Design a protein with these regions (language model features):
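Beta-strand segments within the central parallel beta-sheet cores of soluble alpha/beta enzyme folds
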Residues: 49-58, 84-89, 114-119, 178-185, ...
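Active-site-proximal alpha-helical scaffold in enzymes
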Residues: 89-120, 169-199, 279-286, 375
């Protein structure tokens, strides 16, 4: 049953995903975010930028980006100076939590049109040096993005998140072979989808003023995801089997630096470091209908869950049921699940724990959407 306050997806866009220090390395997170916002607003057809009432953008590595990165991106995209903007830092689920924030504003009747999404430039994340106590520099990607600051009963604060993935392997009995097979299949699907043009509608080609490796020359237009284009066809199971385990005891866990005898998580079964941004335009059903905006999907429910950070890997199995309850749906009603592949073990663990079917990419924050012509 429809409602005037239904949260409808009326526009979407994303940049290509650039590899670490790759094609988009010369562009800041703010520049990438503004491109995604412009593309999303343009995809709505008749929507004027002045109609956007609020912006929520996920952004984790904000050190050195200046005040209010979300506002910077919104203004650079041509939105009004009167638009309130908020940055969300929830690590891997920052962008999806931004979607939830925007959806709740619409559902509460506070807003009719919001822009939501996320942006990141891991290539531009700076090094950090303590003001006192020595001048040793720490990369902010490692400190702010890849290290557990809270710890738990088994992993100390400062542990690499990859050790939590290894812990999940221990507790769930997931072996190296299963993770390599999952990673290989993920690369295969990404490569096949790219070749079939499945991402063409959502990617807004990004123009880099000049190659990031030189100080002048012609502009370069980036049209596709760099990691998939460079490695997708070659990242086979045989190649993945050659990689060494990436995480060792002593990676901040209080150990002695001794390598795990049976480490399973590798760079191939972990997420890449990358640059890019994505955005959605959300609108109330009433506003979308009155202004002839295309309704691409309806957000029916959301769910958040948390547990000890060393067990972040299985939090989606708690968030998914919460989202389904909020949407008054059951798992039998769901045609597609997406699970965040921070590590292959996350998808494998939650596929079994939540009794899900085919899984590709669910973050710790989950949304249930109705997508397609049926509104």
């Amino acid at each position: 049953m429809s409602s005037p306050l239904d949260v409808c997806i009326v526009g979407y866009s994303r940049t290509p995903i650039g590899s670490f220090r790759g094609a988009l390395a010369s562009q800041t997170a703010v520049q990438l975010g503004s491109a995604a916002i412009r593309g999303a607003v343009a995809s709505c057809g008749t929507l004027r930028p002045a109609a956007v009432e609020e912006v929520f953008l996920g952004h984790v590595l904000s050190a050195g980006c200046g005040q209010a990165p979300a506002r910077q991106a919104a203004l650079l995209a041509g939105l009004s100076e009167s638009v309130p903007c908020t940055s969300v830092n929830k690590v891997c689920s920052s962008g999806l939590k931004a979607v939830v924030c925007g959806a709740l504003a619409i559902h509460a009747g506070l807003r009719d049109v919001v822009v939501v999404g996320g942006m990141e430039s891991m290539s531009n994340a700076p090094y950090l040096a303590a003001k006192r106590g020595g001048a040793a520099a720490v990369h902010s990607v490692q400190r702010d993005g890849l290290t557990d600051s809270c710890g738990g009963s088994l992993l100390a604060p400062g542990s690499a998140m990859g050790l939590a993935a290894e812990l999940c392997c221990d507790e769930r009995g997931i072996d190296r072979e299963a993770m390599d097979a999952h990673a290989a299949e993920s690369y295969r699907r990404s490569w096949a989808a790219t070749r079939a043009g499945a991402f063409r509608r959502e990617i807004a080609p990004y123009t880099v003023p000049y190659p990031s490796t030189c100080s002048g020359g012609d502009a370069v237009v980036v049209t596709g995801d760099e990691e998939v284009s460079r490695r997708g066809e070659d990242m086979t199971l045989e190649e993945l089997r050659k990689l060494r385990p990436a995480f060792v005891k002593g990676d901040g866990d209080g150990g002695e630096g001794k390598k795990k005898d049976h480490g399973r998580v590798t760079a191939g079964s972990s997420s890449t470091l990358s640059d890019g941004a994505a955005a959605l335009v959300l609108a109330s059903r009433r506003y979308a209908t009155d202004n002839n905006l295309p309704i691409r999907g309806v957000l029916r429910g959301v769910g958040d869950a948390a547990q000890a950070s060393e067990r972040f890997t299985t939090a989606p199995a708690l968030a998914a049921p919460a989202a389904l309850r909020h949407a008054h749906r059951s798992s039998a009603d769901v045609d597609l699940w997406e699970i965040n592949e921070a590590f292959s073990v996350v998808a494998l663990a939650n596929t079994g724990a939540a009794a899900l079917c085919v899984c590709v990419y669910v973050c710790v924050c989950v949304c249930v959407c109705r997508v397609g012509s049926e509104q």
